[in-house]
Regions:
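Conserved alpha/beta-domain cores
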Residues: 31-216
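Glycine/Thr-rich beta-alpha phosphate-binding loop at enzyme active sites
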Residues: 16, 22-25, 172-173
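Glycine-rich, flexible loop/turn motifs
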Residues: 16-17, 160
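Short, compositionally biased
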Residues: 20-36
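Conformationally flexible catalytic loops at phosphate/diphosphate-handling active centers
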Residues: 1-4
């Protein structure tokens, strides 16, 4: 037990959990002056997917975000397949439909839930690194990953090799996902035009043909 007047050392430098040591523990402080380090010719940009880590990561020496993945926001914050939000009536499982209704009840519409959550997540990342560029990759889930989202099984084909299948740019203009991609575009438009975070730049992933880029 610690008594009044006891000397202890409290350490928060050993991971997620703090430690308390009896007595005064000797330690060495190493200070590095980052301003004195020469800057490389190549711009160093970070990868990020979780908005919760954005404001911590921004303090690392960096030239912006080279890849901001939106899959974490969709899977952890939205949790619902975009097409299930556009067409909730097509979700056949009553329990899944009820869970979608519960998650979206505070939004004007299910589709607005997607736009709000995605724009707030991307906006947090963009604000943390402002005014440095933040390159946001549009969704690049594979079909099996999309199917694992709430309501996703109703909208995704089963593929022998999802890694090379219906993903990236090929999805965006396809009738099976065009309305879902429109929600992504609405969210990123809100980040740039309503939030004013014009440091956001878009990346279209897995573009296999020039025609796919033109269609997008």
């Amino acid at each position: 037990a610690i008594r009044t007047g006891d000397e202890v050392t409290v350490s928060c430098a050993e991971g997620d959990s703090g430690h308390v040591y009896a007595g005064r523990v000797p330690f060495t402080t190493i200070t590095t002056d980052l301003a004195a380090l020469p800057m490389p010719r190549t711009r160093l940009m970070v990868n990020i997917g979780n908005p919760d880590t954005a404001f911590r990561t921004r303090f690392l020496p960096n030239d912006g975000v080279g890849l901001a993945r939106i899959e974490f926001i969709v899977a952890e914050h939205i949790r619902i397949h975009p097409m299930a939000l556009v067409h909730p009536d097509q979700v056949r499982d009553a329990a899944v439909r009820a869970e979608i209704e519960r998650l979206t009840r505070n939004a004007p519409s299910p589709a607005d839930h997607f736009v709000r959550e995605l724009s707030e997540g991307v906006g947090t990342i963009a604000a943390a690194f402002w005014p440095r560029p933040v390159i946001v990759r549009m969704s690049d889930f594979k079909t099996n990953e999309y199917a694992s989202l709430l309501g996703g099984a109703c909208f995704e084909p089963q593929e022998a090799n999802p890694m090379l299948g219906f993903r990236g740019a090929a999805r965006y203009a396809h009738p099976a996902y065009a309305e879902g991609f429109a929600l992504e575009c609405r969210a990123l438009k809100r980040v740039r035009e309503e939030m004013g975070l014009t440091n956001v730049k878009l990346m279209i992933p897995f573009c296999r043909r020039v025609r796919e880029a033109e269609d997008v």
